[in-house]
Amino acid sequence: MAAKEIKYDSVARDKVMKGVDTLANAVKVTLGPRGRNVVIEKAWGGPTITKDGVTVAKEIELEDKFENMGAQMVREVASKTSDMAGDGTTTATILAQAIYREGTKLAAAGMNPMSLKRGIDKSVQLVIDELKKISKDIRDKKEITQVGTISANNDNTIGEIISEAMEKVGKEGVITVEEAKGMETTLEIVEGMQFDRGYVSPYFVTDPEKMEVVMEDPYILLYDKKISVMQDLVPILEQIARSGRPMLIVSEDLEGEALATLVVNNIRGTLKCAAVKAPGFGDRRKAMLEDIAILTGGKVVSEELGIKLDSITLTDLGTCKRLHITKDNTTIVDGAGSQADIEGRVKQIRTQIEETTSDYDREKLQERLAKLVGGVAVIKVGAATEIEMKEKKARVEDALHATRAAVEEGIVPGGGVALLRTLPALAGMDLPDDERPGLNIVKRAVEEPMRQIAANAGFEGSIVVEKVKENTGNFGFNADTEKYVDMMEAGIIDPTKVVRFALQNAASVASLLLTTEAMIAEAPKKKGAGMPGGMPPDMGDMEY
């Protein structure tokens, strides 16, 4: 076992602080409408230019192991906020840095980190309760456009396309983002269905860079049991191989000999195929398989119905125009099922929704209905160069997540105003004396996002914060126009869910780091002495 190096107390916290600062200082320059770009070198191809906080955070790895621990913890804040709310990564990083920085000062002055943590936790909970009071539900297309625009770094085109997509497929509909062939960013609405099951083996992927399976005009085999023996599949596979078209198997599971044979055939190119597990469980799985069958014009192969796997023909299989599978999701686009059958199924599900008494069943039935009716909206992102394309696509994906979050939990004034408006409630909070410093840490931290937005726009953050604090309601600083405005009226809004997760995740990690008393890392290896100079002995008389 390699020797370990251990650091304690303030020495450990100082090392962590250095790592946190290194990462946060690189990320926070991207915040706000006047946020700067960060250029990231890539081992292959050209550099990436981005204004996305989580992209910057993911690239940072520090040489010092103790500093790197701090940086990685804050990177986790950005990454988790992105996964849960889709946006707010830079805000979360700034809040984590502010809470930890103020906390380390107080811990160094002799205060108990556990008391600080208790004070921080209680204060954060109060801020979240206040945010919920300030929050306002989204009612119209204009507000959806505004949220999308802000999250896409003030790109109004993206905001409008997202709101149009949501209007077309509904708030529960599926929206995907793809790269366009030209320079225009466009929206396509396609009938389709998405379910939360990915490929059973990564050897099925057709695009190794994105780890995705994309198929055109595939046959779709739907089976309600497990497939492990190849013998049952051989007759239908031979028919499909002769047709030259790809194939998708949707079954309870695919394993053993059957999976191995399909993978080998796929790699060799004999038969392009993929397999996914059937969505849902029990009776719901059977119902969802039937939904897919109706959408694709196929049949569910079920021994209960007297149909055996080794006796089916191509007419029993479903088809669709396009199939898109990731490790988590499968999207069937433009199924070949008849419109009359689909409408009949929709009517049946609607009747079940009306009759059910269980909220859970109703929710699941509505999900199935959305999959059958909603269709898929495809946003095709266009740009002049590949570098710009990747950056723009990342912004569209961020904006899409943020817009969904806004529809879910409502919106608050943006530009850091919502957090600032929780200060009066924090000031009136009653805490024990040993926990009050934790409250003061949060009071200082909630000002930080607005300070940074102002600083990135070339203004003195403290002056802007004081001016906004003097006023009430939605009054705030528009860094884009450099004016003080009503943030809601100006369309500068944040999804409540994004602000909430940013603060919760930041406080959680910063509190953990504050209460860290020891850090252990592998000791750096001592380099051995180099080879001595000079000529080896007995070689002086060699001729050259």
Curated annotation (Swiss-Prot):
Together with its co-chaperonin GroES, plays an essential role in assisting protein folding. The GroEL-GroES system forms a nano-cage that allows encapsulation of the non-native substrate proteins and provides a physical environment optimized to promote and accelerate protein folding. GO terms for biological process: protein refolding. Keywords: ATP-binding, Chaperone, Cytoplasm, Isomerase, Nucleotide-binding. The keyword Isomerase applies. One of its GO terms (cellular component) is cytoplasm. This is Chaperonin GroEL 1. Disulfide bonds: none annotated. Gene3D superfamilies: GroEL (3.50.7.10), GroEL-like equatorial domain (1.10.560.10), TCP-1-like chaperonin intermediate domain (3.30.260.10). Its EC number is 5.6.1.7. Belongs to the chaperonin (HSP60) family. It comes from Syntrophus aciditrophicus (strain SB). It catalyses: ATP + H2O + a folded polypeptide = ADP + phosphate + an unfolded polypeptide. Transmembrane segments: none annotated. ATP binds at T30, L31, G32, P33, K51, D87, G88, T89, T90, T91, G415, D494. Its main location: cytoplasm. The gene is groEL1. One of its GO terms (molecular function) is unfolded protein binding.
